[in-house]
Amino acid sequence: MNPSTAQATAVVDELVRGGVREVVLCPGSRNAPLAFALQAADLDGRLRLHMRIDERTAGFLALGLAIAGKRPVPIVMTSGTAVANLGPAVLEANYARVPLVVLSANRPYEMLGTGANQTVEQLGLFGSQVRATISLGLAEDDSTQNSQWRSAVCRVLAAARGTRSGNAGPVHFDIPLREPLVPDVHVHGPVPEGRPGGAAWTTTQNATLDVPVDLDLTADTVVISGHGSALRPELAGLPTVAEPTAPMHGIALHPLALSQLKPKQAIITGRPTLHRQVSKVLADPSVDVYALTTGPRWPDVSGNVLATGTRAVVTGTPDPAWIARCAALTEHAETAVRKQLDAHPKATGLHVAAAVMDALADGDQLLLGASNPVRDAALVSYPKPAVRVLSNRGVAGIDGTVSAAVGAALAYEGGRTVALMGDLTFLHDASGLLIGTGEPRPSDLTIVVANDDGGGIFELLEQGDPQYAGVFERVFGTPHGMDLAALCAAYRVPHAAVTVDALATTLAQPANGIRVLEVATDRSGLRELHASVRAQL
């Protein structure tokens, strides 16, 4: 076989040997050798291939597949702007530590700077946002290159998984390909072989880091369980403010209850991304703050952390009076939220979040959009223990949420997937609904859109203060007036407009593929609703 075909065949084979099971491919000419090899592997049942025409959407599809499947997922594209469109997904994968592999085809490097069409300096395009930038040299008619190709693939996967660094994340794998870009009509020459028995060319053991931190639990302690945290059994029994995507280590502590407490000690696990009340506690110089994290990132936004480590060595027991007070304040906060929801005259995103959280069953997978939905979910209730919760909290952008939900649903075989997002988030990534004929489709994905015709989160921020009412609606509210039913019809995705009261009943019915449930909400009273909740505390 010709050199480019041989190289692509070896790369795809080694990806499969290294544990890759899902690959997203965008059509192009320069990446044709990879496309042929991927299609062959898909037909052989060695991996599942997903075709997408938009690289930005494809990147977030791969992100969702990687998060839910807990495996590296390559996204393969041609050269030029196709690679640049992966920027947002790479940023999210970097800060969320998701093993995304950007596998870009390139022109032969001698074409750079010559004015050759669709040729850009794409090597190094992602800079510090990737764990590694790895390039293969041009393939030659030389069988000894097989070991170099396969070794490079193993290096890519190790960097993406963080097996040597403890820091998983995106990797840019760039492959220059010379013509011919299609397989020979009459195959000749040896097929590049891998290790016997389907083994990876190079195996890498996970690096381990054990840094104990001594903690005395007799002090009044709260735990802040942030995104990316692992379960910490040593913290069981402690009041815990857990983000929806994070494990509940101990006794649930409502985030609004923090304003009524004066803890002496706070323990961070993972990376907190929500709640101003949490930020205030962690920045309070009278609170001793400790951080339990893995990976190289510094886990201290406020500069107030006393010590960091990977696990706690605990002594002492919590004061029962402190535990009882935290439990009582949590119950009071939960009651206040639900009471004010019942009293509020109009449906809001908070009402939709409450209906969704209440309707979830064991085995469900929930994907929460950024902006208000993830915050609303945190305020109304903590997810049931057997519900799997995902969200793009790396850089907490709204982009790519529909595509990530599709990817997460495709990778999850344990039950149904429900995605909750706002209307701007849905519109921003509506092209994520475009799935080609014959492509793998989720079997049970419901996208719930809380449609308040604009940016509801700004109603709750400083910009939403009545003194700025004259400019607020156009530049922050951003009403769009879009017909979501017509938009869904264009993508041939079933759509239904439902009320908050009917949402639970509708969610109980199977999606039978992908469906969109639109709930009309009002954002004009959001500021008043949240103020009324706080007034009850």
From Swiss-Prot:
This is 2-succinyl-5-enolpyruvyl-6-hydroxy-3-cyclohexene-1-carboxylate synthase. The keyword Coiled coil does not apply. The keyword Manganese applies. InterPro entries: MenaQ_synth_MenD, THDP-binding, Thiamin_PyroP_enz_TPP-bd_dom, TPP_enzyme_TPP-bd. Keywords: Magnesium, Manganese, Menaquinone biosynthesis, Metal-binding, Thiamine pyrophosphate, Transferase. The gene is menD. GO terms for biological process: menaquinone biosynthetic process. It is an enzyme of class 2 (transferase). Homodimer. It comes from Rhodococcus erythropolis (strain PR4 / NBRC 100887). Pathway: Quinol/quinone metabolism; 1,4-dihydroxy-2-naphthoate biosynthesis; 1,4-dihydroxy-2-naphthoate from chorismate: step 2/7; Quinol/quinone metabolism; menaquinone biosynthesis. Its EC number is 2.2.1.9. Its cofactor is Mg(2+); Mn(2+); thiamine diphosphate. Gene3D superfamilies: 3.40.50.970.
